[in-house]
């Protein structure tokens, strides 16, 4: 692909409102639209304008009946969806961290295993992990970390304390790099998964978690990572083919984990509540297949 100059000048929110109107977007309240462009930004909102464009989208002309109100509806729905997903992934992140930290300490007999290079396959990855972990430890102002630094002589706390500084992606990185395949299998089995699937699903959840943390669009995004399939599934799962790059499949993964760590979870109720508040949302854009509610996972 040949590169070219950016070639676009800055436009004020007022000028952007006029530009959108000239392209066919219906704006009933120019002042309110200008306020949203000032507080949210045109670039962020453009992701929610994109589905309303005519084909070919490169012409930047809007479909008949496309409104700025619809843009804001999509924006608000995505925001609510991110909050829902992040709150549910948090529970999984805590449970997975506990399993990896404690099960590894128990099996290896090393409560400081996070800093033991002998337990890891790839030493370059381990070194990078230690650099990251050391920085997190040194700059942490958490009470439990400050207490350990004041009280004990060891350079680092035990894994179940130090691990509290690690986000899901880092926990998965440590897990993937473990030498002991039997240990990895044992940890994955805690969640009724094979080790490669466990790794893959954690990677997908990490992407979704980070998207939620950074307020990125999730509702109709196509993920770059395609999660592995689990063969011989022993727990309720989905049977209707679904696009594994869409957020629906991610939500299935979230529900699967929740059903293990919190069997009485109310994720489905939260989803119904969200969808009822945004009846205009086309669930197919999120990857939901027809009949999804009848799947064993969602019963």
What label would you give each PLM region?
Residues 1-207, 219-299:
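Extended intrinsically disordered or low-complexity regions, especially N/C-terminal cytosolic tails and loops
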Residues 215:
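Acidic/aromatic/glycine-rich contiguous surface patches that form carbohydrate-binding/processing clefts
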């Amino acid at each position: 692909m040949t590169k070219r100059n950016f070639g676009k000048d800055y436009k004020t929110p007022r000028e952007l409102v006029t530009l959108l109107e000239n392209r066919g977007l219906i704006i009933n309240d120019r002042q309110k639209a200008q306020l949203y462009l000032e507080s949210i930004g045109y670039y962020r909102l453009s992701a929610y304008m994109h589905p309303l464009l005519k084909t070919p989208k490169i012409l930047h002309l809007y479909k008949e009946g496309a409104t700025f109100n619809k843009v804001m509806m999509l924006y608000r729905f995505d925001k609510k969806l991110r909050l829902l997903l992040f709150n549910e992934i948090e529970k999984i992140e805590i449970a997975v961290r506990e399993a990896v930290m404690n099960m590894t300490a128990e099996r290896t007999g090393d409560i400081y295993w996070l800093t033991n290079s002998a337990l890891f396959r790839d030493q370059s990855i381990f070194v990078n992990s230690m650099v990251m972990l050391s920085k997190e430890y040194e700059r942490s102002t958490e009470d439990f970390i400050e207490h350990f630094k004041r009280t004990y002589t060891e350079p680092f706390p035990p894994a179940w304390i130090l691990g509290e500084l690690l986000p899901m992606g880092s926990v998965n990185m440590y897990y993937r790099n473990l030498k002991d395949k039997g240990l990895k299998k044992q940890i994955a089995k805690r969640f009724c998964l094979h080790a490669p699937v466990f790794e893959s699903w954690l990677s997908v959840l990490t992407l979704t978690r980070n998207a939620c943390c950074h307020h990125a669009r999730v509702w109709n995004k196509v993920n770059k990572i395609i999660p592995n399939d689990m063969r011989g599934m022993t727990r309720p799962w989905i049977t209707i083919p679904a696009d594994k790059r869409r957020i629906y499949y991610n939500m299935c993964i979230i529900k699967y984990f929740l059903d293990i760590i919190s069997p009485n979870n109310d994720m489905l109720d939260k989803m119904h509540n969200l969808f009822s508040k945004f009846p205009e949302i086309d669930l197919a854009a999120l990857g939901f297949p027809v009949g999804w509610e009848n799947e064993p996972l969602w019963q």
